[in-house]
Amino acid sequence: MSEFVTVARPYAKAAFDFAVEHQAVDRWQDMLAFTAQVTRNEQIAELLSGAVAPETMSKTFIAVCGDQLDEPAQNFIRVMAENGRLLVLPEVLLQFIQLRASLESTVDVEVSSASPLNDEQLAKIAAAMEKRLSRKVKLNCKIDKSVMAGVVIRAGDMVIDGSVRGRLERLADVLQS
């Protein structure tokens, strides 16, 4: 998997630089998301991992994508096909998203709670995380009944566990030691 990261990095950087230069970051992210989804199709994955000529591979892939790809994106796919790298498109997408977040000074923050949070609670969490991280945050909320009460906040490798479950686990650890 780390090989995919290494292989995908220059493609993601090239796509991102092109998208920024042409003010088409949203469009390129959508195109990359679509192509990444196409590579997850079993039949396409078999085609891409088989011994097919790069030209045939790129033509077939572009035909499957149809109108979703503009001319520069088709050229991007051709280059990746020539180098046998179409299977790394999902990783290219992930790195493209990271580059975009870095450019926009945003960070994705996952907020897990036992029940839905109201707008006021979300605003307070967003403000606190923006202050702590010195960046804009994009909250991704999910319901997790195992949290019991409170919230668990994840941003990158940072975890803030304000859940009742987390408190009970920490209390149990203290009592056992």
Curated annotation (Swiss-Prot):
Coiled coil: none annotated. Keywords: ATP synthesis, Cell inner membrane, Cell membrane, CF(1), Hydrogen ion transport, Ion transport, Membrane, Transport. It is a peripheral membrane protein. SUPFAM superfamilies: N-terminal domain of the delta subunit of the F1F0-ATP synthase. PROSITE patterns: ATPASE_DELTA. GO terms for cellular component: plasma membrane; proton-transporting ATP synthase complex. It is found in: Cell inner membrane. GO terms for molecular function: proton-transporting ATP synthase activity, rotational mechanism. Pfam families: OSCP (PF00213). F-type ATPases have 2 components, F(1) - the catalytic core - and F(0) - the membrane proton channel. F(1) has five subunits: alpha(3), beta(3), gamma(1), delta(1), epsilon(1). F(0) has three main subunits: a(1), b(2) and c(10-14). The alpha and beta chains form an alternating ring which encloses part of the gamma chain. F(1) is attached to F(0) by a central stalk formed by the gamma and epsilon chains, while a peripheral stalk is formed by the delta and b chains. NCBIfam families: ATP_synt_delta, PRK05758.2-2, PRK05758.2-5. HAMAP family: ATP_synth_delta_bact. Belongs to the ATPase delta chain family. F(1)F(0) ATP synthase produces ATP from ADP in the presence of a proton or sodium gradient. F-type ATPases consist of two structural domains, F(1) containing the extramembraneous catalytic core and F(0) containing the membrane proton channel, linked together by a central stalk and a peripheral stalk. During catalysis, ATP synthesis in the catalytic domain of F(1) is coupled via a rotary mechanism of the central stalk subunits to proton translocation. This is ATP synthase subunit delta. The lineage of its organism: Bacteria, Pseudomonadati, Pseudomonadota, Gammaproteobacteria, Enterobacterales. The gene is atpH.
